[in-house]
Amino acid sequence: MRILVFSDNHGSLKELDHVLNNFKFDRIFGLGDFEVNKYELEERGVFGVQGNSPFDPDYLIDRICEIDGVNFLFTHGHTHQVRYSLLSLSLFSKKNNIDIAFYGHTHMARIDEDNGIYFINPGSISRPYYPSYPTCAIIEMDNSKILIKIIDAITFDVFKEICILKNGRS
Protein backbone atom coordinates (compact mmCIF):
# COMPACT_ATOMS: atom_id res chain seq x y z
CA MET A 1 0.00 0.00 0.00
CA ARG A 2 1.36 3.43 -0.97
CA ILE A 3 -0.25 6.62 0.31
CA LEU A 4 0.52 10.26 -0.50
CA VAL A 5 0.01 12.98 2.11
CA PHE A 6 0.41 16.64 1.17
CA SER A 7 -0.56 19.96 2.70
CA ASP A 8 -0.85 23.67 2.06
CA ASN A 9 -0.80 23.84 -1.73
CA HIS A 10 -2.44 27.30 -1.57
CA GLY A 11 -3.89 27.33 -5.07
CA SER A 12 -1.08 25.52 -6.88
CA LEU A 13 -1.56 22.03 -8.30
CA LYS A 14 1.71 22.01 -10.26
CA GLU A 15 3.82 20.26 -7.61
CA LEU A 16 1.03 17.83 -6.70
CA ASP A 17 0.59 16.87 -10.34
CA HIS A 18 4.36 16.40 -10.68
CA VAL A 19 4.30 13.86 -7.83
CA LEU A 20 1.15 12.15 -9.15
CA ASN A 21 2.68 11.85 -12.63
CA ASN A 22 5.74 10.05 -11.21
CA PHE A 23 4.26 7.71 -8.59
CA LYS A 24 1.20 5.47 -8.27
CA PHE A 25 -0.75 5.78 -5.02
CA ASP A 26 -3.50 3.67 -3.48
CA ARG A 27 -4.79 6.67 -1.50
CA ILE A 28 -4.13 10.40 -1.39
CA PHE A 29 -4.79 12.65 1.60
CA GLY A 30 -4.66 16.45 1.55
CA LEU A 31 -4.31 18.35 4.82
CA GLY A 32 -6.08 21.56 3.88
CA ASP A 33 -5.36 25.10 2.68
CA PHE A 34 -6.05 23.92 -0.86
CA GLU A 35 -7.46 27.15 -2.35
CA VAL A 36 -8.61 25.24 -5.44
CA ASN A 37 -12.00 23.93 -6.49
CA LYS A 38 -12.81 20.76 -4.56
CA TYR A 39 -13.67 19.02 -7.84
CA GLU A 40 -10.07 19.48 -9.00
CA LEU A 41 -8.97 17.54 -5.93
CA GLU A 42 -11.69 14.91 -6.28
CA GLU A 43 -10.67 14.16 -9.87
CA ARG A 44 -7.15 13.47 -8.54
CA GLY A 45 -8.56 11.12 -5.86
CA VAL A 46 -7.76 13.38 -2.90
CA PHE A 47 -9.48 12.87 0.47
CA GLY A 48 -9.27 16.29 2.11
CA VAL A 49 -9.69 18.00 5.46
CA GLN A 50 -10.48 21.62 6.23
CA GLY A 51 -7.69 24.15 6.33
CA ASN A 52 -7.89 27.58 7.88
CA SER A 53 -7.88 29.44 4.55
CA PRO A 54 -10.27 29.29 2.93
CA PHE A 55 -12.81 27.62 5.16
CA ASP A 56 -14.65 24.87 3.29
CA PRO A 57 -17.61 23.32 5.13
CA ASP A 58 -17.60 20.34 2.74
CA TYR A 59 -14.46 18.93 4.38
CA LEU A 60 -14.09 17.36 7.82
CA ILE A 61 -11.84 19.11 10.34
CA ASP A 62 -10.31 15.79 11.43
CA ARG A 63 -10.35 12.58 9.40
CA ILE A 64 -9.65 9.35 11.29
CA CYS A 65 -8.99 6.27 9.17
CA GLU A 66 -7.99 2.72 9.98
CA ILE A 67 -5.76 1.43 7.20
CA ASP A 68 -4.31 -2.08 7.40
CA GLY A 69 -4.71 -2.17 11.17
CA VAL A 70 -3.11 1.25 11.78
CA ASN A 71 -5.15 4.19 13.08
CA PHE A 72 -4.33 7.41 11.22
CA LEU A 73 -5.42 10.97 11.90
CA PHE A 74 -5.36 13.52 9.08
CA THR A 75 -5.89 17.15 10.12
CA HIS A 76 -4.77 20.61 9.10
CA GLY A 77 -3.85 21.24 12.71
CA HIS A 78 -4.98 24.82 13.23
CA THR A 79 -7.78 23.71 15.57
CA HIS A 80 -5.13 21.84 17.60
CA GLN A 81 -2.85 24.91 17.78
CA VAL A 82 0.07 23.03 16.17
CA ARG A 83 1.89 26.28 15.40
CA TYR A 84 2.65 26.55 19.14
CA SER A 85 2.76 22.99 20.47
CA LEU A 86 1.75 19.41 19.72
CA LEU A 87 0.07 19.02 23.14
CA SER A 88 -3.53 19.43 21.94
CA LEU A 89 -2.90 17.14 18.96
CA SER A 90 -1.24 14.60 21.25
CA LEU A 91 -4.16 14.59 23.71
CA PHE A 92 -6.69 14.27 20.86
CA SER A 93 -4.63 11.42 19.35
CA LYS A 94 -4.42 9.54 22.66
CA LYS A 95 -8.16 9.94 23.24
CA ASN A 96 -8.89 8.50 19.78
CA ASN A 97 -6.29 5.67 19.84
CA ILE A 98 -4.32 7.18 16.96
CA ASP A 99 -1.06 5.51 15.94
CA ILE A 100 0.10 8.11 13.41
CA ALA A 101 -1.16 11.70 13.19
CA PHE A 102 -0.54 13.80 10.07
CA TYR A 103 -0.96 17.55 10.29
CA GLY A 104 -0.07 20.63 8.24
CA HIS A 105 -0.56 24.38 8.81
CA THR A 106 3.03 25.28 9.79
CA HIS A 107 4.60 24.65 6.35
CA MET A 108 7.49 22.95 8.21
CA ALA A 109 8.24 19.28 7.56
CA ARG A 110 8.95 17.27 10.68
CA ILE A 111 8.64 13.87 12.34
CA ASP A 112 8.04 13.58 16.09
CA GLU A 113 7.09 10.78 18.48
CA ASP A 114 5.45 10.99 21.88
CA ASN A 115 4.48 7.94 23.94
CA GLY A 116 4.29 5.69 20.89
CA ILE A 117 2.26 8.10 18.75
CA TYR A 118 3.98 9.50 15.66
CA PHE A 119 3.29 13.06 14.52
CA ILE A 120 4.17 13.81 10.91
CA ASN A 121 4.01 17.16 9.15
CA PRO A 122 4.70 16.72 5.41
CA GLY A 123 5.52 20.42 5.04
CA SER A 124 4.01 22.51 2.26
CA ILE A 125 3.84 21.18 -1.29
CA SER A 126 3.94 24.69 -2.77
CA ARG A 127 4.87 27.37 -0.18
CA PRO A 128 7.48 25.84 2.13
CA TYR A 129 9.09 27.43 5.19
CA TYR A 130 11.34 24.51 6.21
CA PRO A 131 12.94 23.01 4.32
CA SER A 132 13.08 25.69 1.63
CA TYR A 133 11.73 23.38 -1.09
CA PRO A 134 8.25 21.87 -1.56
CA THR A 135 7.70 18.62 0.30
CA CYS A 136 5.13 15.87 0.77
CA ALA A 137 5.02 12.52 2.55
CA ILE A 138 4.85 9.03 1.12
CA ILE A 139 3.69 6.14 3.30
CA GLU A 140 4.61 2.61 2.21
CA MET A 141 3.00 -0.14 4.27
CA ASP A 142 3.30 -3.89 4.27
CA ASN A 143 2.42 -6.60 6.80
CA SER A 144 5.36 -5.84 9.10
CA LYS A 145 6.31 -2.17 8.74
CA ILE A 146 5.32 1.36 7.84
CA LEU A 147 7.93 3.44 6.02
CA ILE A 148 7.21 7.17 5.97
CA LYS A 149 9.36 9.44 3.82
CA ILE A 150 9.13 13.19 3.58
CA ILE A 151 10.43 13.97 0.10
CA ASP A 152 11.26 16.92 -2.10
CA ALA A 153 8.20 17.21 -4.34
CA ILE A 154 10.36 18.17 -7.34
CA THR A 155 13.50 15.98 -7.16
CA PHE A 156 12.01 13.22 -4.93
CA ASP A 157 15.11 13.31 -2.70
CA VAL A 158 14.38 12.14 0.84
CA PHE A 159 14.40 14.91 3.47
CA LYS A 160 13.40 12.76 6.49
CA GLU A 161 12.20 9.21 6.97
CA ILE A 162 11.14 6.81 9.67
CA CYS A 163 10.43 3.09 9.64
CA ILE A 164 7.83 1.97 12.16
CA LEU A 165 7.48 -1.74 12.83
CA LYS A 166 3.87 -2.77 13.19
CA ASN A 167 4.68 -4.37 16.54
CA GLY A 168 5.34 -0.85 17.85
CA ARG A 169 9.09 -0.38 17.57
CA SER A 170 10.86 2.00 15.20
What are these regions (language model features)?
Residues 45-47, 82-143:
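Conserved beta-sheet core of the metallophosphoesterase superfamily
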Residues 15-18, 67-68, 96, 120-170:
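Binuclear metal-dependent phosphoesterase catalytic core
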Residues 30, 66-67, 113, 141:
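Generic beta-strand structural signal
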Residues 5-7, 27-33, 47-52, 73-76, ...:
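Active-site neighborhood of phospho(di)ester-bond hydrolases with catalytic His/Asp-centered motifs
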Residues 2, 45-47, 71, 118, ...:
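Conserved beta-strand segments of alpha/beta enzyme cores
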Residues 49-51, 58-99:
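Helix-adjacent hinge/juxtasegments
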Residues 1-44, 54, 60-61, 69, ...:
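N-terminal active-site segment of His-dependent metallophosphoesterases
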Residues 11, 36, 79, 108, ...:
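Short active-site segment of divalent metal-dependent hydrolases/proteases
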